[in-house]
Amino acid sequence: MTAPAELSPTLQLACDLIRRPSVTPVDADCQAQMMKRLGAVGFQLEPMRIEDVDNFWATHGNQDGPVLCFAGHTDVVPTGPVQQWQHEPFEALIDADGMLCGRGAADMKGSLASMVVASERFVQDYPNHRGRVAFLITSDEEGPAHHGTKAVVERLIARNERLDWCIVGEPSSTTLLGDVVKNGRRGSLGAKLTVRGKQGHVAYPHLARNPIHLAAPALAELAAEHWDEGNAFFPPTSFQISNLNSGTGATNVVPGDLIAVFNFRFSTESTVEGLQARVSAILDKHELDWSIDWALSGLPFLTEPGELLDAVSASIKGVTGRDTQPSTSGGTSDGRFIATMGTQVVELGPVNATIHQVDERILASDLDLLTEIYYQTLVRLLA
């Protein structure tokens, strides 16, 4: 284990944040530590407590010129069985292999530390930089995400805040730091479908209507449907059934209804309204007695090659020597809320191989490299 005195400023802050057990939506004073550091170098701080969620918005600079925002979350997912961890989940130690171990190391307290240290250095090196450096931080990303970034963005829009570029510190890298950045995400549309039949005795099927038998052909057709072709930036839209429930538990009772939960991860080639209409048409074709509750988690967004992606790519190349690969794969992130401001959004963070797992860990030295990548991006865009 590396002694604290030997740690870089980024690693010292990362360890401090990891040692705070901020399981969503608890912040455990992580944001207070970040704001203390940012305030010391001249950032204007605006805490935003919304319901049970801590958020903050911070800016440095002037209203003239573009805004580059660092966005992220201080909350982490639960540890799972603590006894399965090699080390205490919130101990934040660097092992003999040089790995920083602890819940949140990759997702995403390491990124938060790199953002803070890079910004401290930038505003000290360029006190009269153009535009503004901003932070949008929440403790509600791993949970429902109702009172976090989404709510803060709504407030920013209401007061006409400008947000040109945003780097979200999600762990985007796959094998090596910076090998992949996320320049967009698919939309997520969920549904809970109820198909109604008529309960009865299995020995008297003519007196019942089995919703399992009735729904099966429609569900099979939905699963086989080709929703779109995707495009140069997005794979084709996917449909997956995640839950299927029916029956009373008794073996001699035809159930009265069936509930199916499914999800679309959709590209920019499809719309919410279009997907909903096609689902309705298939269900009606099979003459089902049905109802459905839809839940939109986020629309797809895409940052095409331009100032932000170019600056991030050049910084990764300059620091690591490798070319990055833009990607829109994976799940949703808070970038979907920020993109509604017309903002160019890129996700760039550590290797994601162990996120949400027991023994979450990243290469400790990657965080100093990530700090330099963030710093170089600031220089390219705002110096």
Curated annotation (Swiss-Prot):
Which cofactors, if any, are listed as required? Zn(2+); Co(2+)
Q: Which Pfam families does the UniProt entry name for this protein?
A: M20_dimer, Peptidase_M20
Cofactor descriptive note: Binds 2 Zn(2+) or Co(2+) ions per subunit.
What is the reaction catalyzed? N-succinyl-(2S,6S)-2,6-diaminopimelate + H2O = (2S,6S)-2,6-diaminopimelate + succinate
Q: Set out the biological process GO terms recorded for this chain's protein.
A: diaminopimelate biosynthetic process; L-arginine biosynthetic process; lysine biosynthetic process via diaminopimelate
The residues annotated as the active site are D75, E141 (proton acceptor)
Q: What is its EC number?
A: 3.5.1.18
Pathway(s): Amino-acid biosynthesis; L-lysine biosynthesis via DAP pathway; LL-2,6-diaminopimelate from (S)-tetrahydrodipicolinate (succinylase route): step 3/3
Q: Which InterPro entries match?
A: ArgE/DapE_CS, Bact_exopeptidase_dim_dom, DapE_proteobac, Peptidase_M20, Peptidase_M20_dimer, Peptidase_M20A
Q: Which Gene3D superfamilies match?
A: 1.10.150.900, 3.30.70.360, Zn peptidases
Binding positions (Zn(2+) 1):
H73, D107, E170
Q: Where is the signal peptide?
A: none
PANTHER family cross-referenced by the UniProt entry: ACETYLORNITHINE DEACETYLASE, N-ACETYL-L-CITRULLINE DEACETYLASE
Q: Briefly state the protein's biological role.
A: Catalyzes the hydrolysis of N-succinyl-L,L-diaminopimelic acid (SDAP), forming succinate and LL-2,6-diaminopimelate (DAP), an intermediate involved in the bacterial biosynthesis of lysine and meso-diaminopimelic acid, an essential component of bacterial cell walls.
Instruction: Supply the name of the protein.
Output: Succinyl-diaminopimelate desuccinylase
